[in-house]
């Protein structure tokens, strides 16, 4: 498995079927706070998001608190501002890309000794992934990545924004199948507490940034 890392030191995985790298996790509050602090962005929208979904420490969350690690209630334009800060090539995925990532992660099994450890991934990313991998029923990349039983992720469907994902029912009851269903907000500009995002990076950046690439498995 080929991992590269963004400027917040969170991992992306190469998804060859659609020629992108994809964030292994939805974007966390830790990452978004770094963006606000370094870019000097407006903190008020972030406070609105926190009111919908309060934070939890990366090294102390329980199974029932997983969703509190991640940015939710965000709007597509705000997610794109974060993508621009991360650097060239970063973007919200298209519907086709997201579903290809889902299929890729579903095919990938985690080894018994998970490769996601604080030694390999220092900082919050390693803490979060180690605890996620240790949670019950999270023995596949699809589960650890929270593409299953996680959030609804913003994606681009032609000229409109829709959501893909199926949160765990304890967080938000639903019967969605992200491979066949899309989730559409009722009102434009509505902050939805179960909507988050992950990004893709288009282009073979991992070939140009070899110092930020690791093979694990």
What residues fall within each predicted segment?
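A short, contiguous structural element within a folded domain that forms the immediate neighborhood
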Residues: 115-141
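A short linear-motif detector with a strong N-terminal bias
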Residues: 1-2, 50-51, 131-132, 174-180
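Extended hydrophobic/Leu-rich segments
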Residues: 5, 66, 105, 121, ...
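Short acidic N-proximal helix/loop "leader" segments that mark the beginning
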Residues: 1-14, 51-53
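Short, solvent-exposed secondary-structure boundary motifs
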Residues: 1-6, 61-66, 132-134
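Active-site microenvironments of metalloenzymes and redox enzymes
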Residues: 16-114, 204-213, 217
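Surface-exposed recognition segments
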Residues: 136-217
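Short, solvent-exposed coil/turn segments
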Residues: 8-10, 15, 64, 137, ...
